[in-house]
Amino acid sequence: MTQKLTPMMQQWHQCKEQAGDCLLLFRLGEFYEAFFDDALVLAQNLDITLTQRQNIPMSGIPAAYLDGYVDRLVSRGFKIAIAEQADNSEGGKGLVPRTINRLITPGALLSSSLLPEKANNYIIAISQVGSLYGLSCLDLSTGTFLVAEYDNTKDLIEAVYRLAPTELLSHAKFYQKNEPVVKQLQQHLRITLSEHVSWAFEYQSATKKLYTCFQVSSLDGFGLQGLVPAINAAGALLSYIQDKLLLPISHLSIPKIYGQHKHLLIDKASQTNLELLSAIHGEHGKGSLLQVMERTSTPMGGRLLRNTLVNPFYDLKEITLRQDSVEFFLKQEPLRKTLKRHLSCVRDLERLATKISTTLASPKDIGMLRDSLLSCMHIAHDLQSYTLPEFLTNKCLISSSLKSLIEALSTDLLQELPLKVSEGNIFADHYHQDLLRLRNIKTNSKSWILEYQERIRQETGIKKLKVCYAQALGYYIEVASSFAPQLPKEFIRRQSRLHAERFTTQELQQFQDEVFSVEDKLQTLETKLFKELCCYILQHRDLILELSTTIADLDYVISLAELAAEYDYRRPLVDHSDALSITKGMHPVALTLLDRGTFIPNDTIMHSAQTRMILLTGPNMAGKSTYIRQIALLVIMAQMGSFIPARSAHIGIIDKIFTRIGAGDNLSKGMSTFMVEMAETANILHNATDRSLVILDEVGRGTSTYDGLAIAQAVVEFLLFTEGKKAKTLFATHYKELTELELHCQHVENFHAVVKENGGQPVFMYEIAKGHSKKSFGIHVAKLAGFPLSVVSRAQQILHQFEGPDLRPEPEKAQQLVMF
């Protein structure tokens, strides 16, 4: 192919081979061009013109707008390779060299408008050694680096769901061998698949890459001893980032183990069913628990809240520490308001540190860092006079080294800083001895021009003579065409206009050379000083990241205190008991959607020695689903260290939450609604423990009545009597037959959603009371839904016949079908 192409297209072909499955943007002058299939992709996704040259499809984008176009492509899951042309300022002859200098993928964003402010942007790598799976996870924009190891695909998949990465890395053999796993991840996540060489996933290569990156000779200090699959995944991910994407890795934090035992586990189905991060029928998180709880003021605090929401604590100490801090700020309202004001001025310290580490920082970024650090100093000062809870003790103290940095940035930088280093005006005059001298020359040039203009007006007698500046011409003298013959011979013609002539002089040309030289010297000097400043800031990087963690923790607990104050939340007692007792509990999301005082609170009392299963009956629309979801949400909030919407609560720590609520067909897997329901229920039966909380809504409804009832009762009995599986369970059902279990098992208690009748019409009270429901009121709900009245009337007739002695109603004669 290359023999038939021009030299430039041969160069493109070489770059395309290196780019692999990336879309190649090839720099040609002031445009980035795409050719062949890439041109079609570019035109289709960016709505730009597709053209042809010598029968080669091509499309292009202006170099000045590259970042915006790249963001649009990456947001659609494309991987981009950028081929830049070498500097040809010296005017060398021949083809300008071009090489790929960066690759951009959805999971490897250092700085982009696509980065969510209050969420991480993860890329993960997975390796396999025998039956073990290694997982590594990176957020390049913050430097966060996590590793984990799993002995089954279920736990691996759930971990990936919780991390919600935008890109998955492995090698071809893994993808072939684990196709069902990969398809499942693609089905539930918007994730781009990437491949890397298989040898990078081998232990020797992986450890060497980790040693080099972190300047160590052993990984034992990171707690990775024996975790071969995790090490393989981590090393391969670093290799991919550095060697293939050509991105820096020196700013990464040391790898931390992403451990299951530290958190309350909430699987993907439960996250969705409970609408933790986004509402099932909402947009952009509206109607979710996250939307209700989001009161954070900083990007770091927002990310911490989001991560904790899907990974609540299982360690009682961690929960109590945060509860104490929330209580402290709840009582200290003036301090809380003051700190929130300061926190709102703190920018993303993690990502600013990454930008500086990777030489992507602009002067404006350094200004944001300076202002953020000043706000942190104000926070530390405001906290000094208080006796802080243990969680915050010493957290907001700023070291003397960091104080020196803050002082330097405050005194040495100008207040308003430019977006680009080339724009200058970054440092104060006193910062360097040559700055003031060069700036004075530049400033005095304006007065020199005015003086020169006035002098030659006097010498020539032309009062309307002007000295002007244009980018193409530089400085010039302009007079009306009629005055041009009066000018002395030393005036050199530069340009003729319709009614004017433009000239220069030796004196003006000499002045221009001096001014331009000064501007070049100023730009060179400030560029050099800016690089030195970034190096100085990097000496404090670890302190900045430590401060970032502190600010995130502080923002987190203050936001929970704000939430508690706004809705009068109370502190739950969380301990190692097996109690689940909630008085006057309310659904945190529904509470915000209704007028104050209109939500009906309900109690819950469960205890392994007494009631550990509630069978909940009642008609649709009476509040059953809201109630059982409410219990799960309150447990999650409590184990986040948050206060909850309840008068009081006693919650023994829960290890896992499972939900089986609603379903739809899974066409991509060839699974019916009932099959999805059974698969989710099977997962619960296999993985629930005595310390789990299980929420079941209408299990068994997707098949015949007796089949469904049999399945439902078998599930109930399994969770009641199987050792190690005796989870606290709330089971909402329409099967009245199940309520008889209360007579035979002391651990089962019937409750129902209260409905009163008024003139034969049901009135939903949204109260949960002891006992089982007597009626379902399904026909009434059908009427409310808009059923034709004739259908409603016929349904009532059939219901009366079912409830009478003859349990097999005959079809109306007019409706009987003639079968033969």
UniProtKB/Swiss-Prot annotation:
GO terms for molecular function: ATP binding; ATP-dependent DNA damage sensor activity; damaged DNA binding; mismatched DNA binding. ATP binds at residues 618-625. SUPFAM superfamilies: DNA repair protein MutS, domain I (SSF55271), DNA repair protein MutS, domain II (SSF53150), DNA repair protein MutS, domain III (SSF48334), P-loop containing nucleoside triphosphate hydrolases (SSF52540). The keyword DNA-binding applies. This protein is involved in the repair of mismatches in DNA. It is possible that it carries out the mismatch recognition step. This protein has a weak ATPase activity. Belongs to the DNA mismatch repair MutS family. This is DNA mismatch repair protein MutS.
